[in-house]
Amino acid sequence: IIDQCVAQGVPFAREYGGLLDNRSFGGAQVSRTFYARGQTGQQLLLGAYSALSRQIGLGKVKMYTRHEMLDVVKVDGRARGIIARNLITGKIERFAAHAVVVATGGYVNTFFLSTNAMASNGSAAWQCYKKGAYFANPCMVQIHPTCVPVKGDFQSKLTLMSESLRNDGRIWVPKKLEDAKALQAGTKKGKDIPEADRDYYLERRYPAFGNLVPRGVASRAAKERC
């Protein structure tokens, strides 16, 4: 998979000798993660988009933008196409196929807060489920523990912060309640809290992993304190 991504143009970080570099990541105790600075996910998307654009240019793929799937068409118990709506004209369109591949991403926006795209709302998964597709492990939803909270009228969702932040930095909360209240009120800044009054709770509770515990563990621990 990594070689395929490199062939598509994903600029993974490299060592001075030219070999692909590795770093530590959440849930792992050894450096085994390929990365592209702090933008690995974005660069993977750009590489995939570039490969798709090439196939479109060669005439092998036809892309329909601004379309929303409304239903799956079944013929003799098999998925043979979809019904979609053109979001520009509002016209209902149908697409026949020998097979239907559902690659709509997650459905995290069924929750109140999410870093995912606003279109990841679970509608595609629900349409497939209604037509008989198996639905396994709905509780296993990927979340991202490091993000910028929604603030103001111009931020529609949480803004994702690279997980490399936990690799390069340290996470802490004030030990004293009065310091936490002062931070919330804006009367004190984090840099004003002395080191002795900071609780590096992930490092304290999970010394083997420290700040690089798995996402679910980091999120639950943060929820307990915030």
Cite the ranges covered by each PLM segment:
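Conserved FAD-binding subdomain of flavin-dependent enzymes
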Residues: I1-P11, K130-A136, V141
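Gly/Ser/Thr-rich active-site loops/lids in small-molecule metabolic enzymes
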Residues: M118-G132
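An anion/pyrophosphate-binding glycine-rich loop and adjacent beta-alpha core
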Residues: Q127, A133-C226
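Flavin (primarily FAD) binding-site architecture
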Residues: V102-N116
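Conserved redox-cofactor binding core of oxidoreductases
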Residues: Q4-K91, A103, C147-S162
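Glycine-rich nucleotide phosphate-binding loop and flanking beta-alpha elements
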Residues: G90, Y107-N109, Q142
